[in-house]
């Protein structure tokens, strides 16, 4: 069995070629590597190698640790749900702003087309509706700002 000397950390350490250099560099140069080295040909062995703690022992047994398939289609559903909620809230805010602007413009148009140029109840209703929606929108924005983490 060939040996090689490596000058890492505390000086020269001798280890055999069967040890993985990455495992040695991470400080797991212990002879009790049951899960990784005994199951080197197992398709799940990389999971065990990644889950080693500093004592050199795996925190998972052979049966419970499985590889997670990573591909371009892998999506985290909680992040997507959170993004969907943010988009819906932004659309609601924009819709409220457009309705407020529309009500205010309708009130202004009604005020301008009247011949006697005095305030009537229809213009006041449009403007009060617009003001009410702006107040609701401000409350929603404050609640959303205060409720965010």
From Swiss-Prot:
One of its GO terms (cellular component) is membrane. Keywords: Membrane, Transmembrane, Transmembrane helix. It is a multi-pass membrane protein. It is found in: Membrane. It comes from the Eukaryota. The chain crosses the membrane at residues 91-111, 122-142. Its main location: membrane. This is Putative uncharacterized protein DDB_G0289825. It comes from Dictyostelium discoideum. The lineage of its organism: Eukaryota, Amoebozoa, Evosea, Eumycetozoa, Dictyostelia.
């Amino acid at each position: 069995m060939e040996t090689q000397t490596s000058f890492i950390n505390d000086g020269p350490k001798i280890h055999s070629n069967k040890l993985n250099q990455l495992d040695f560099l991470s400080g797991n140069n212990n002879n009790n590597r049951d899960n990784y080295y005994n199951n080197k040909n197992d398709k799940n062995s990389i999971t065990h190698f990644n889950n080693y703690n500093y004592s050199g022992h795996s925190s998972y047994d052979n049966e419970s640790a499985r590889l997670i398939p990573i591909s371009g289609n892998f999506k985290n559903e909680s992040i997507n749900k959170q993004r969907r909620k943010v988009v819906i809230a932004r659309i609601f805010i924009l819709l409220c702003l457009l309705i407020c602007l529309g009500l205010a413009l309708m009130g202004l148009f009604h005020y301008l087309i009247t011949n006697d140029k005095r305030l009537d109840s229809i213009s006041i209703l449009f403007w009060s509706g617009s003001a009410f929606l702006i107040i609701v929108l401000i409350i929603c924005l404050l609640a959303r700002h205060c409720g965010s983490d």
